[in-house]
Amino acid sequence: MDNIVDSLNKAYEKFVLASAGVLESKESAGGQKALLTDTALENFKEKWELFRVACDQAEEFVESVKQRIGSECLVDEATGLTTTAAGGQAPAAVTGAATSLPPISAVRLEQMSRAVRWLVLELQRGSGVAPGSVHSSSTGFDSRFSEDSTQ
């Protein structure tokens, strides 16, 4: 993370120096178009692009950290490993109380996550129907689910 911050800081400093260079070259040229001003503008454009790249990299890093924290929180919540802010330990009554669902193992959570990802990919490809599923379009329900067959 320090490398990303340092890279962003250096790119910003170079960008600011390049913008100052443009202003100084315009002032020394008396507002007239000059080779020195054109060179300063090219340098400014280059530093601007490098600064944007550094910003994009920092944004990607922040997003990946947010996703990792979210995943860790999801696993902690699902497996019952949550803690309270005060005291650092959650009583058994508090763990899982928010959802009133029993905790599941991290392995089971990962299996379910993979299954959901697979289904999303299948839906994106347009198939939408898992192999072996029996779906009757004329009746409007999926016979795999007993609650649908009572309709």
Curated annotation (Swiss-Prot):
Region Disordered: start-end pairs: 128-151
GO CC, alphabetical: mediator complex
Keyword line: Nucleus, Transcription, Transcription regulation
GO terms assigned for molecular function: transcription coregulator activity
GO biological process per UniProt: abscisic acid-activated signaling pathway; cold acclimation; leaf senescence; positive regulation of transcription by RNA polymerase II; response to hydrogen peroxide; root development
Domain of life, per lineage: Eukaryota
Main localization, broad class: nucleus
Cell location: Nucleus
The keyword Transcription is assigned to this record: yes
The UniProt record lists the keyword Nucleus: yes
Recorded family membership: Belongs to the mediator complex subunit 32 family.
Subunit structure, interactors included: Oligomers. Component of the Mediator complex. Interacts with MED6. Interacts with GEBPL.
PANTHER family with a match to the protein in the record: MEDIATOR OF RNA POLYMERASE II TRANSCRIPTION SUBUNIT 32
Protein task: Component of the Mediator complex, a coactivator involved in the regulated transcription of nearly all RNA polymerase II-dependent genes. Mediator functions as a bridge to convey information from gene-specific regulatory proteins to the basal RNA polymerase II transcription machinery. The Mediator complex, having a compact conformation in its free form, is recruited to promoters by direct interactions with regulatory proteins and serves for the assembly of a functional pre-initiation complex with RNA polymerase II and the general transcription factors.
Protein name in UniProt: Mediator of RNA polymerase II transcription subunit 32
